[in-house]
Amino acid sequence: MRRQIESDMATDISTRRTDAVGECSEDAVLGGRLVLRQPRRGHRFGHDAILLAAAVGARAGERAVEFGSGVGAAGLALARRVEGLDVTLVEIDPALAALAAENAERNGLAARVRAVSLDVTAPRAVFAAAGLASASADHVLMNPPFNAAQNPSPDPERRAAHVALDRTLEQWLETAARVLRPGGAVTLIWRADGLADVLTALSAQFGAVVVLPIHGKAGGPAIRVLVRAVKDRSAPLALLSGLALADAGGKPTAAAETVLRDCAALPLI
């Protein structure tokens, strides 16, 4: 699925059919503030998308772009939290991009959120044709594929969404740097054991890095890291106290529920 696409495919897909995704479920997130359709089979969004949205420090009047948006969970959650924010959802799969556009419409966000079917690694001209010119965004958010190729899912949709190819992270960050204005921020979620790879990939064009570890249970190891960095800025790395999703007994923590259910922002902002 990580194919190069031609410029005539880099189009707004809000009117395309969503039949190709097959049977869908409707899932409420953010305490019912969003209800999203997503395929029952293949990749399905989870906590990662909502945590990612909560970590983006966007404000009204700015523009955010989500790379690899799937059905739009993170970008739509961000748009729901930040009134007046313009969001573009970038998704390589036309059927999922169409479903993301449908989700924006169903949740009353279509005036501020649009979806385009576009490969994140497409050339500059293809992005510009899709309304994503260089230095045009204030924020880029992403949840890139991060699983090793030697441990792929047998499901092709899950495999495409989760398995990182050579230089996937570097390529996505290169595109983010191109799309962002000077001083714009990229925010991503990644495996905790891959933090060194993220920091290395960011070092070429980003600085002022902030890292928030995410723990599955209090007292346990981090399972994810949320990372924010600023284009063309230099400042020491800041490592924040981690967020535990559950206490030692497995009960959701109040801090996690505030983000996952109550649409609160995370301290990277």
Stretches found by the model and what they are:
Residues 55-154:
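Conserved SAM/SAH cofactor-binding pocket of Class I
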